């Protein structure tokens, strides 16, 4: 990220600390991404399909939601896409992928399938505001998508995706 910005990586680390802290500072939201990711480390893998959307929808529906929406719109309209991709690759895929890497070598694609579903939910519900989806209670969305998320995380993968 530092290279893309044309600055010394040591300075970025000095002023912002971790990549998570840099991401939080860059999007100007008073939430540390690790506050969202850390509880997922404690959750049993068999419950992540429910835990992930529950946590993310609660965040988006909180008082921080409008700022998150504005930030996402801004990031998607410029060079921020690379930054968001880097965050997902370094944080979400690495954190989640290492927990669901069975058979070995599938953790990354499993985490990316989950991320694609959750990004789609956020886009449809908060950015594009597709009705009636945008107005559904969060719990209904969680109950509907959790089985698919869990299948991505722990289910059998189609031929060609597993090594």
Question: Regions from the language model: what does each represent?
Answer:
Residues 1-21, 25:
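Helix-turn-helix
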Residues 16, 73-78:
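Short helix-capping/turn signature of helix-turn-helix
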Residues 28-33:
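Short, basic, alpha-helical segments at the C-terminal edge of helix-turn-helix-like DNA-binding modules
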Residues 35-72:
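Hydrophobic alpha-helical connector segments
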Residues 56, 68-75, 114-118, 122:
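Short alpha-helical scaffolding segments that buttress acidic/His motifs in well-ordered protein cores
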Residues 60, 64, 76-80, 92, ...:
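Short alpha-helix boundary/capping elements
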Residues 81-86, 99-152, 156-163:
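Hydrophobic/aromatic-rich alpha-helical bundle segments in the mid-to-C-terminal region
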